[in-house]
């Protein structure tokens, strides 16, 4: 586990993994947690998150950009619960 990423982001990644259409491989867990950390940090700072920014964060975190839209939908549903 990467100790630079707080555990709460791994918890979010694990929750996403239980609900996403495409199964999440164990090797994707840390990159997904990193992506959630980057994305949620921007959201908490009230920063605008463009499609380009999402792709940049996905590249930085090392996730498949195909997951971006599904993650956005997941966070939208998660935020409404």
UniProtKB/Swiss-Prot annotation:
Pfam families: DUF2543. One of its GO terms (cellular component) is cytosol. It comes from the Bacteria. This is Uncharacterized protein YmjA. It comes from Escherichia coli (strain K12). The lineage of its organism: Bacteria, Pseudomonadati, Pseudomonadota, Gammaproteobacteria, Enterobacterales.
